[in-house]
Amino acid sequence: FAIFPQESGEISISPAKFEARVLRDGRITGRKVFESESHTITVNPIPPAPPAYSDAAWLPARDLTIRDNWSREPDALKVGEPISRDITVSALGQLQTQIPVLQPPVVDGLNIYPDKPALDRRLESDGIRGIRTDQYAMIGVEAGDRVLPKVELPWFDIDEREWKVATLPTRTLTVLPTP
């Protein structure tokens, strides 16, 4: 089971019950009921985001990584040629639907078109891992160097109880004129 509290305070978790029928020699000879203990957990209030990220979405996780992948090397594009960039965020302890959308930047001389995201969830030995991949098609409409700003995603490390920021560095695309 995974529990995602929606408010702070004390939460009581009722016992889980499992009922089984006992078979002997192909016949039902009785039933067994197994019951776990009940639990009470304390859900802390959401800590304030750092001042530089005051509008940050609440994204608690045990681990969070961000990476990008390009359809090809973006160092020498020609005007009108498309290229795609995938940005993948992987968060341990979070559902894929809770990972926020990374809005594409506005860059002069570059048209950027977001595509439908790919959402995935994996069960790992230490919890659920949500994975969100946003894909962006980019087309240079003017020759020159085009700077994509760094991508920053604030998140709260639940083990260290502190805000962190996952970052992709600034990237320069060189758009060459068409012959």
Task: Give names to the regions the model predicted.
Residues 1-179:
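Surface-exposed interaction/ligand-binding surfaces
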